[in-house]
Amino acid sequence: MAKYEKSMTGQFETVINRLHEDIMNSGLSMNMVDESNYAIGDTNIAVRVYDKYFMRNGSRASLSLTVVGHGNDIFVSAIGAGGGQGIVFNFSLGAESNMVAVVEESINRMG
């Protein structure tokens, strides 16, 4: 499992759209599995689940992305999981970390 969290300022829709675009452009086998959106008052919550096939270890890894916005305050949580091979030992060869790194790099480019 790999995890990245960041608090930042920005426009909620801009952040979620940019993250989605960067995640989807990170690999041909990237797939958005599902999404959920919720708003109450000035607070918006978006949850996205992605998965990607990794040829190097013959498995899929998932990325759970949660973005919470309240006004211009944004909180992003990205958790990568799966991607491992084996029953007893879970050798992922960094698949989860690669997916989380896409989110971190995207946020860094946003400033």
Per-region residue spans from a language model:
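Ser/Thr-rich, low-complexity intrinsically disordered terminal regions
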Residues: H20-L63
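Well-ordered alpha/beta subsegment
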Residues: A95-G111
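Conserved mixed alpha/beta catalytic, RNA-binding, or beta-rich assembly cores of soluble enzyme
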Residues: R18, D22-N25, S29, S64, ...
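Short beta-strand element of the conserved SAM-dependent methyltransferase core
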Residues: Y4-M8, A46-K52, V67
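Terminal, regulation- and interaction-focused segments at domain boundaries
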Residues: M1-G27
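Conserved active-site and cofactor/substrate-binding residues in soluble primary-metabolism enzymes
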Residues: G10, T14, R60, G94, ...
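Beta-strand/loop substructures that line and gate deep hydrophobic ligand-binding cavities in soluble
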Residues: N57-F89
